[in-house]
Amino acid sequence: MAWTYFVVGSGSIGRRHSANLQSLGKIVEHLAWREFDAEAFSNSLARCSGQAAVIIATATDVRSELVDICAVHNAPMYIEKPLAFTQKDVAAIYGIEIGLQQRSMVGFMMRYHPLTMFLSKFDSCEFFRLQFEIGHDVRLWRENWSFSESYAARAEGGGVLLDLCHEIDLACMICP
């Protein structure tokens, strides 16, 4: 039986994951969060008999239900960054079976860029001072997108700090 990849979230990132998997010839079920049916999703995972993986590309504050369902079915997850919105959600994720944790990951993909890997090899004790600057214009992040109407603008969405956590992750990698 071939693997089925479930992509949950129909924003720009969810659409990109779905398109990338389809271009690789994978079986993809793309589910919009707004029409999400937890019972139907759980049944679909069960039908895959352990041959399913889930890409979670929803707003941060609605992921815990998805993670719980994936854990019940032992389905590995790729969770778009940031991982969670509350400490309770982080604790729940870290509470899932260790084998499933080891087969899942958070989408901090910039840490695998060759420059990041090169810089992270330096001994941070030798740094006198480092300065990080982020030059994003949030109005230009995504096509046909308005920051004021986005999940990142809502307190429940985590705000810009969580949306720009790639940069915080990079700083922590380069200067542990």
Language-model-detected regions and their locations in the chain:
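N-terminal Rossmann-like dinucleotide-binding module
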Residues: M1-E39, L45-R47
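Beta-loop-alpha module in the N-terminal Rossmann-like domain of NAD(P)-dependent dehydrogenases
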Residues: H17, D37-Y94
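Recognition helices and adjacent regulatory flanks at domain boundaries
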Residues: L31-A38, V62-V67, M110-Y112, T116
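Histidine-centered beta-alpha loop that forms part of the nucleotide-sugar donor binding/catalytic region
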Residues: A59, P82, G107-M109, E133-G135
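Rossmann-fold dehydrogenase core element
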Residues: A92-M109, C125-F132
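Predominantly a Rossmann-like dinucleotide-binding segment in NAD(P)-dependent oxidoreductases
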Residues: M110-P176
